[in-house]
Amino acid sequence: MSKFYKFITISVLFYSILMCYINVASAKTWQCSFKDGWTLNQDGTETSLSKGTFYGTREYLPPDRMLPLQTHGPMETQILEEMVYQPVATTLIGHAVVEIGSMTLSVSETLTDKESIITVIFHDGVTKALVERNLCIRIE
């Protein structure tokens, strides 16, 4: 009897993990709007990002990419195209090191059904870090 219960437990866990992965991979499109954020300068000065009405739309392309459908501009498009994403349960976690002109950025994102949290570390320049929170919904 003990082996039977172990088999059932392992089967249920495997099925649960598989369903979480399929859930993220099958629901592919998100629309996100800016909620809040801030930057940190070299001297430690924190500056709030001004709230806009802009929203962006992106589509997850398994196994690890994001297709920007609507963005704020070419810089955001390039960042999204270079990010590599990994599904973890119902969340997508992305990262990239991006070179834009003379800037080198380390970018990370955690994307869920409800929000996106993006962090950017700047290699050079006056601005050293940026954190941005966005409200997101799955639209497909």
Language-model features: locations:
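Positively charged n-region of N-terminal signal peptides that target proteins for export
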Residues: 1-6
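Sec-dependent N-terminal signal peptides
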Residues: 7-16
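Boundary at the C-terminal end of the N-terminal hydrophobic targeting segment
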Residues: 25-27
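Short, solvent-exposed loop/hinge segments that bridge or flank secondary-structure elements
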Residues: 31-70, 101-109
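Contiguous, well-ordered beta-strand patches that form the walls/edges
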Residues: 64-106
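Low-complexity, intrinsically disordered Gly/Pro/Thr-rich segments
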Residues: 113-124
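Edge beta-strand at a domain terminus
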Residues: 123-140
